[in-house]
Each structure stands twice: as structure tokens, then as C-alpha cells.
């Protein structure tokens, strides 16, 4: 086995199979495992996906939320063992791959047009 095959085998073991389809503009709820002392708990983090970077086991999403009037962004490794769950709450209709322009917007200007799926 050469080096590339070994790396591919290691990455294949770390990739989670039960993830939902996540797109830029989705409103998601990420369950993050937090360790406080010797206790562990799941902390939910809700927000809009403003960026997604695909790179096999190193895929990341950037989630932005408003907390007490201040924008907070956090980058999550999708396949990290610290991520317990990712739930897509709603979808939005966007025309950009990265929604960095939301950083300058304030209040109602940060709203995105909601996308409804046909049943």
C-alpha cells in the first residue's frame, strides 16, 4: 500500500454516513458536544449556513447567528466526532455560493427568501 491509499482508508473511516444534505442558505441546528470538567453535554447552535467548503473528511460549514444584536460566526468540521447531530430546519433560496454579504446587513435585511418544497 502506498501513502495515498493509507490516507484514503483513514479518511473513509472518519466520514459520517448519516448527514443530511446541507446547502448554503439553510437554517441548521448543530448539536455540539461540550466538555465541562468531567461532564459532557450537547450544546445546540442554530443559525444560517453562509459558507460550505467540501474536502472529503475535512468538509466545513460556517454558521452565522445573531446573539444579543451581535453577529456570531462559527466554523464546524462536519465529520468531527464533537458534532453529535446536524438538523436542517428550513431552506432558503439563494443565488450565491457564499453569503458573506450578510455580515454587513442589519435587522430585517438579513432575512433570506424561504424555499418551499413540493410534496
From Swiss-Prot:
Alphabetized Pfam families for the sequence: Ribosomal_L19
Protein name: Large ribosomal subunit protein bL19c
GO-annotated molecular function: structural constituent of ribosome
Gene Ontology CC: chloroplast; ribonucleoprotein complex; ribosome
Subcellular location: Plastid, Chloroplast
Record-stated family: Belongs to the bacterial ribosomal protein bL19 family.
Organism domain of life: Eukaryota
Disulfide links within the chain: none
GO biological process: translation
Keyword Chaperone belongs to the record: no
Keywords for the protein's UniProt record, in alphabetical order: Chloroplast, Plastid, Ribonucleoprotein, Ribosomal protein
SUPFAM superfamilies named among the record's database cross-references: Translation proteins SH3-like domain
